[in-house]
Amino acid sequence: MMGKPQVLTFIDWYKPFYKAGGPVRSMVNLVDHLSDRVDFHIVTGDRDYTASSSPSDLRRDQWVTSDRGEQVWYAALKGRTMGRLKQLITERKWDVVYIN
């Protein structure tokens, strides 16, 4: 039996952030409905829309397991480099890379 498809997703904001509205809600809904069949790895920013700083308790620049089992990488501003993006893309074989 084959494992779940591995999906790497890039989105500017993801939960717990919400001020960006629709795109965040759409990604949360996608994970909610497909997490039993798909392994999501989500790369996102470390602060909410229009926020000048990130929450002090947020774990940045590492994979964090969220409530539906999805892995989330909250990228700090200084960590959003082409080198880091390339590293995340090439660290494993993804079945799909989804850029939202």
Regions picked out by a protein language model, each given a short descriptive name:
Residues 22-34:
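Short amphipathic alpha-helix
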Residues 11-17, 33-79:
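N-terminal strand-loop element at the rim of the active site
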Residues 3-7:
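Extreme N-terminal starter segment of soluble prokaryotic enzymes
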Residues 27-28, 59, 82-87:
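A generic local structural motif
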Residues 23, 78-81:
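Conserved donor sugar-nucleotide recognition element shared by glycan-biosynthetic enzymes
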Residues 20, 75, 99:
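Flexible, glycine- and charge-enriched loops at secondary-structure boundaries
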